[in-house]
């Protein structure tokens, strides 16, 4: 099976979409697929092209058997909304043009921004091939959830376009059951929806002793470390976390933030203004280095802003943390909270509730029996959400449906 996969993010970028796409495609190649990735020059989240790459019309490379074609796009930091829209639109157009010359049996496009799916839909019409909408986020609802834009004519148009693309997709693969329920409630045929969640890469992430060199380098020996590794974006509510840290007088607790994003500078400035001593900010690290830094963490902090839309998401940090037996302090409601509580893999606090967060931190630090029970829960969670197993499920689902779709698909778009 020849797969054309269109994605805005791909390694060496190391956010959740890039990681999932790479790991899935890598597994599909082992199952006999020929995969071509259509993406842009790596630049997330700073909007700066990574060393060794250029923002050219076409770039070709091979990454562990995956054919990667990079096309030009308007590049900007993950900050201002209108500039990001230009980024998305330019990549949609460039990927469409490049896709015209790539042979495939099926076309897959992944969100969260769905302009990649416009490219996939257009290619499917012209090339008469089935296409899959991989749904990572309910966009544009998530735009409003972080106050990037208020409801108006633009959001109405985006909502119409979103629903149109769901209906036109041959298959929709959402990452959560909540996404599936949302689609069904909006009239999308349940029979063409298959949930494939994110999962744990058990080959990269596994339980291990704390990395003593990293502890020494950061001068954090003997500290109870609460770690956040990932995007410092508008959705994560890290300003709330920093404000809460300023009210914690336990000097043995230390907070470690690793990553970058639209809010990174703001929360660093906030911590300096408040003269917080028990906090460390580090620049982004490559994916292969994450396990070493995660090893020194006692608690994995996973917050999001308080919003109904975030009740539908499952942060990928859950699966990396569970694979390394790191109990989680989760500030997310909805399906993510259900998973953590069902597996007893962490403690949940109400998003943006300072007193609840502080209380749960103390509980995790001082209740050793609870901590060990949560570690056992992490092991069970990671085993059930094995990334390889989920990648194979997705490939099998696509394979089983593609031949039938080829026979019956008649485009009337």
Residue ranges and their predicted role:
Residues 4, 220-236, 241-245, 256, ...:
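Conserved donor-binding/catalytic core segment of Leloir-type glycosyltransferases
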Residues 178, 199:
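Carbohydrate-associated surface elements
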Residues 236, 286-293, 298-322, 329-338:
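Nucleotide-sugar-dependent
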Residues 250-252, 258, 265-292:
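Nucleotide-activated donor-binding/catalytic signature segment of Leloir-type glycosyltransferases, i.e.
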